C-alpha cells in the first residue's frame, strides 16, 4: 500500500491480505473487506484504479486496471471489476462484475 492512496474515513474489516497498488487512489469513507486486490492489470503498474467516495468493496473482490469506480458503488464479495463503473450508487457482482441493482 503506497502513501497517499487513501483519502479520509477508510474502514478495513477482516484485514489480512489486502493488496493496493501504490498508484491507486481511493476516495473518502470507503470500506474494504479482507483479501481484496486493488491494482494494475497485465503488468502495467501505472494503470491503476481510481475509486470514488463511499465505495464498499466486498471480501475477495478485485478491482484491476486503469478504471474508475463512481461514488457510492457497492462491489460484491468475489467480484472482479475490470471495466469502469461510471453510474453512482449501484451494486455490482460477479466475474466479470455487472450491475445488478441501482
Give the location of each predicted region.
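Left-handed beta-helix
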Residues: 2-3, 8-9, 13-22, 27-28, ...
